[in-house]
Amino acid sequence: MEKTMEKAEDLQAAPPSLGKKPDWLKVRYNQEATEEVAALMKDLRLNTVCKEANCPNMGECYRKHTATFMILGSVCTRNCRFCNVSCGRPEAVDEEEPMNVAKAAKQLHLKHVVLTCSTRDDLEDGGALQFAKTIRAIRELCPGTTIETLISDMKGRTESLDIVLEAKPEVLNHNVETVKELQRAVRPQAAYERSLGVLRYCKQHSPDIRVKTGFMVGLGETEEQIDRLMDDVLETGCDILTIGQYLQPTKEHYPLARYATPEDFARYKKNALLKGFHHVASAPLARSSYRAWEALEDVHGLY
């Protein structure tokens, strides 16, 4: 039976100053489909960013038998203030993980697979080799399936980026997350210019790969700052842009400043398309990998 609910773990109650949480942030999920996909992930010892990051779209994606696989474990070496993924000392890299991801993708009959990761600053290559191995395993078991990688900045090491690019995913995603002015407060172990550099390098060295990034609103940014961010990202050659509402995971995370309206998101999309982005997903519940296959289909004819 399908339910409509507000999930306490990912859609926190609005701070008193913001009033009641808007109706457009309510989500729907199918419990049976959610449990089925979750059971498969558990059997194969896999993580999904859907669960670890408490994504509000988890129910819809699970209902459609899709999931974003989070490789390299569920513990991150960074402590970004917006993110619900645990921070600490990660476990050793699981050598069976690439093939297990491929097995799950085959069992779920996925046409488009999204791979993301916990940031692994403890690894010399930032986890690049595990990405490459997973891409190749999926190619082996699921020929014809397209692949999207949502990578960390890998400390800006071009040799690590090359390892991922040489495995030839259809889409290379790296998120800038927020405007330049809020970077230090929101993700202190990252850097705005480094993220732009990752996008630029990937597009320049693999022009046939679609490059993608995304950011959140509701952290205290201004309209002018959003506009400058779009210009900075477009200059890198980025093809695809996602814009979504920041949802404060717990009271310990970065404070929510505002709820952008659906009209705000429509305006952001119109502005980004006018600037020259090839595809823009801009909505309150838009996330990096949400309906990712639609973005790929939209830009597929460009190359």
What are these regions (language model features)?
Residues 1-68, 99, 103, 133-144, ...:
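Auxiliary Fe-S-binding modules of radical SAM enzymes
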Residues 49-61, 72-87:
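Local cysteine-cluster metal-coordination motifs and their immediate loop/turn environment
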Residues 71-72, 149, 282:
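Small/polar loops that bind or transfer phosphate-bearing groups
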Residues 75, 79, 84, 109, ...:
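Conserved functional loop/turn residues at catalytic and ligand-binding sites
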Residues 76, 119-122, 154, 220, ...:
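Short, glycine/serine-rich, charged loops/turns that create anion-binding
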Residues 79, 123, 182, 251, ...:
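Glycine/Thr-rich phosphate-binding loops of Rossmann-like dinucleotide-binding domains
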Residues 84-101, 107-198, 212, 216, ...:
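Core AdoMet radical
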